[in-house]
Every structure is written in structure tokens, then in C-alpha cells.
Amino acid sequence: MASMGLQVMGIALAVLGWLGAILSCALPMWRVTAFIGSNIVTSQTIWEGLWMNCVVQSTGQMQCKVYDSLLALPQDLQAARALMVVSIILAALGVLLSVVGGKCTNCVEDESAKAKTMIVAGVVFLLAGLLVMVPASWTANNIIRDFYNPLVVSGQKREMGASLYVGWAASGLLLLGGALLCCNCPPRADKPYSAKYSAAARSAPASNYV
């Protein structure tokens, strides 16, 4: 059975990954202005997130606007919004399961049931980590593809924002924490040892009959 220290480390890493996923989802920095071509000298920077976009002036003033329509978002950001929300919900469920199945809690008395609950929590964290990695990698791939596409004007090219890096870090923490929790093996049932004796065959003394 995995030690309590390994279990606590797995839960801590998964919780950090969950918080990182929330931060990545909330920050409006999935795409940022690429300072190339005609954008080398500009007085403003554009941030694009899942829920809003922001314009940062050179003076430090920032104005943010929530998207008016979901259909106005690019396809990758629409998918990223859905996957990130599902990932955060799954990670929250994993945190709840890890608390229920923790060795230091008394929510479940049976040690075997506790270990199985922790394994389920680990699998949930692994799924949440994958759901964070997919939109972050997909968005990064589209940004890089458009950046090197000569048909895209420089004013529409973007660079990877901080939210993507936070998302990758959160995904790694969720995957690592989930893997550690999956190491919880249910204890084997201790069966009482029963000694079996076999009666020795007795040979009767030979009798001589007349």
C-alpha cells in the first residue's frame, strides 16, 4: 500500500494543477499581439482569452470586453472553453474523492474501499490533465501555424500567451498527481492461517490365523 506521504504529495500536486487550470481558464492571455512587421512599433497590446479580450495601452491603461457572442470566437477557443470547464469540474470531483478516500480522514472506514476511492480520484485527475493539455496544445499549434503562414497579415498574427504556459504546467501537475494516486493498491485480505493435519495411515499388526 502506498505510504501516506506519497498520497499527500499526489493530492497536493493535483490541487495545484486544479488551481492552475482555473487560472489558465480565467486569464485573458491565450493569444497576444505579435510584434512583427507593422506591429513592431505599436501603442497597444491585444490579449485574447476564452471569455474576454483586453487592450493594454502603452500608458498601462487596460480595457477588457466580454465576448458578445460565442460564435464570434475562433473554433479552437470555443473548444478550449468547453474542455477547460469540463476539466475544472472533473478536477473538483477528484479533489472531493481524494478527501473521502484519504488515509487521514474517516469518511470511509474500510481500507480497501479507501484505496479504491483514491485510485478513482487518480484516474479522474489524469482525465482532467488530458483535457487541459488538449486545448492548450491545439491553440498553440494554430498560433504557430498562422504565425508562419505568409497569407496571414502581420496585424492578425498572434503569439502564445501566459495562459497556455499555465495550462501546460497545470496539466503536468494533474497528470503527475493522478499517477501518484493511482499507485494506491487495495490491501490484500488477511486470511487466518489454518493448519491442516492428515492422519497417518496406521498399519495393523499382521495376525496369524490357524
UniProtKB/Swiss-Prot annotation:
Cellular localisation: Cell junction, Tight junction; Cell membrane
PROSITE patterns: CLAUDIN
UniProt keyword annotations, A-Z: Cell junction, Cell membrane, Chloride, Chloride channel, Disulfide bond, Ion channel, Ion transport, Membrane, Phosphoprotein, Tight junction, Transmembrane, Transmembrane helix, Transport
Region (Interaction with EPHA2): 1-103
Modification after translation, per record: Phosphorylated. Phosphorylation by EPHA2 is stimulated by EFNA1 and alters interaction with TJP1.
Disulphide bonds in the chain: C54-C64
Reactions accelerated catalytically: chloride(in) = chloride(out); bromide(in) = bromide(out); iodide(out) = iodide(in); fluoride(in) = fluoride(out)
Transmembrane segments: 8-28, 82-102, 118-138, 161-181
Extracellular face of the membrane: 29-81, 139-160
GO-annotated molecular function: chloride channel activity; structural molecule activity
GO cellular component: bicellular tight junction; chloride channel complex; plasma membrane
Record PTM Phosphotyrosine, positions in chain: Y209
Cytoplasmic topological intervals: 1-7, 103-117, 182-210
Cited Pfam families: PMP22_Claudin
PANTHER family cross-referenced by the UniProt entry: CLAUDIN (PTHR12002)
The family this protein is said to belong to: Belongs to the claudin family.
Role: Can associate with other claudins to regulate tight junction structural and functional strand dynamics. May coassemble with CLDN8 into tight junction strands containing anion-selective channels that convey paracellular chloride permeability in renal collecting ducts. May integrate into CLDN3 strands to modulate localized tight junction barrier properties. May disrupt strand assembly of channel-forming CLDN2 and CLDN15 and inhibit cation conductance. Cannot form tight junction strands on its own.
Protein name: Claudin-4
Organism annotation: Canis lupus familiaris (Dog)
